[in-house]
Amino acid sequence: MVNIEEWQPKTKLGRLVKEGKITNIDEILSNKYVIREPEIVDVLLPNLEVEFMKWRIIRGKFRSKKPYRMAQKKTAEGNKTRYEVIAIVGDKDGHVGVGLGRSSDLLIAREKAINRAKLNIIKVARGCGSWECACGAPHSIPYQVEGKSGSVRVILKPAPKGVGIVADDEIKKIFRLAGIKDVWVRSFGKTKTKMNHVFAVFDALKKLSNVRVQPFFIKFSGYTEGSIINK
């Protein structure tokens, strides 16, 4: 958590946040302002949670999952190790971000991933777009949407209340931190490439806010973007 007294903003947006002239993250995201300082997100979303995507590590007969991927490169000086970390941040109330960090030091890679996830934070459109449910509560997504990253393509479909998040365990983390409780996910392509899988889902969540929604559908589906608790 950032100490707002010690924080010295480097951007105009950061100064406006520190001075208290901007107090809502949705104001920034709705106006498409570019966030260049992770401290802005720390101040406006104090309840932000962090999770790390786990990669499957195979060493001989042993298999395990680790919150990082390690690669080694042979050089004249010897083997050089590089770590890759994917962080997912969210407040479970309509805001989520995903970031990738790389470094020869694991702690630095984690820090880079968290900071980039904060800089990439988006507000997520939620609603009840399932014809089987039609409860009007924002527990799912309002309509079907597709996302793509590399060779991976995903389709997100609204699900009735109680279905839960029907997806891979690592992908579930994005929806939980975004505040989505029920959704169906179909994945195509090389989904074992976890990095592309995660970013394909993130791409789909971004596109939820790109659709022009009619007033009657807003009322019918309980459509909302960003925070519900603070409205």
Swiss-Prot record:
Kindly indicate whether the keyword 4Fe-4S belongs to this entry.
Answer: no
The gene coding this protein: rps5
One GO term in the molecular function aspect is: rRNA binding
What's one Pfam family the UniProt record gives for this protein?
A: Ribosomal_S5
Which species?
A: Nanoarchaeum equitans (strain Kin4-M)
Task: Say yes or no: keyword Transmembrane helix present.
Answer: no
Q: Which domain of life is it from?
A: Archaea
GO CC aspect terms: small ribosomal subunit
- Cystine bridges: which residues? none
Record domain S5 DRBM: where:
61-124
Q: What's this protein's function? A: With S4 and S12 plays an important role in translational accuracy.
Q: What is known of its domains?
A: The N-terminal domain interacts with the head of the 30S subunit; the C-terminal domain interacts with the body and contacts protein S4. The interaction surface between S4 and S5 is involved in control of translational fidelity.
Q: Indicate what this protein is called per its UniProt record.
A: Small ribosomal subunit protein uS5
Q: Which family does it belong to?
A: Belongs to the universal ribosomal protein uS5 family.
| Transmembrane regions | none
User: A GO biological process this protein is involved in?
Assistant: translation
Q: Which UniProt keywords apply?
A: Ribonucleoprotein, Ribosomal protein, RNA-binding, rRNA-binding
Subunit architecture: Part of the 30S ribosomal subunit. Contacts protein S4.
